[in-house]
């Protein structure tokens, strides 16, 4: 696999759907993550990210336009001790509750499947960052229909230990626009994290997401030595 710039990867498609990036800053001192949402329908575009404790949740920007909250209102980011959970749906809570009961990330997700939004059957994507004793590792998961067949769910977990400085991985729900939307395939994309600046990275991601379809972006940098973090949120609706 060839390592690619996140700007190039994002700008090459009009609709990557929802996406999670996790990696390590260029100087190796920060664990970094980003989560973005995009939308094609009025209901999907009518959203903002808001802070919620140590994490975030989605909210309707205009409550009068909210049609079906089931798949669009959720907490994408929650923190459990030294673990930061990032997902594209309410499986954030499933992982949080499972790991709180000593299940692993992968075990917690066994009770979940792709989203029931036929004919897309949008994959559920999840990530977890673990920062402890000045060490950092992470994992990613995708739960997807069996090539569009909703009768079976394919589950993939990717775990990354000791990732070098300046590298990361990117997983997203869709390979591009279409009807139905084509689900992500293969391993998470190997991407460069060529900065130590949270604002520069936030800008790089936001500016390379399709202007019509992008909705919100969350970025967090966690100091691996201390566990302290800083975050950024950008909402198209404001």
Indicate residue ranges for each PLM-predicted region.
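Conserved short alpha-helical segments that host acidic/polar catalytic motifs at enzyme active sites
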Residues: 1-238
């Amino acid at each position: 696999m060839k390592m690619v710039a996140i700007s190039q990867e994002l700008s090459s498609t009009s609709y990557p759907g929802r996406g999670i990036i996790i990696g390590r800053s260029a100087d190796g001192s920060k664990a970094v993550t980003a989560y973005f949402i995009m939308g094609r329908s009025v209901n999907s575009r009518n959203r903002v990210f808001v802070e919620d404790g140590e994490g975030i949740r989605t909210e309707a920007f205009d409550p009068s336009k909210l049609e079906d909250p089931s798949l669009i209102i959720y907490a994408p980011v929650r923190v459990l001790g030294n673990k930061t959970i990032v997902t594209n749906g309410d499986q954030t809570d499933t992982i949080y509750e499972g790991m709180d009961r000593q299940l692993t990330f992968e075990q917690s997700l066994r009770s979940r499947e792709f989203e029931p939004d036929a004919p897309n059957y949008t994959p559920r994507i999840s990530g977890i960052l673990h920062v402890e004793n000045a060490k950092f590792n992470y994992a990613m998961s995708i739960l997807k229909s069996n090539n569009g067949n909703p009768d079976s769910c394919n589950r993939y977990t990717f775990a990354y230990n000791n990732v070098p400085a300046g590298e990361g991985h990117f997983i997203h729900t869709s390979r591009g626009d279409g009807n139905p939307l084509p689900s992500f395939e293969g391993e998470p994309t190997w991407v460069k994290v060529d900065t130590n600046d949270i604002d520069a990275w936030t800008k790089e991601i936001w500016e390379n997401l399709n202007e019509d379809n992008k909705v919100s972006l969350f970025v967090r940098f966690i100091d691996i030595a201390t566990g302290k973090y800083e975050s950024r949120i950008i909402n198209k609706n404001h």
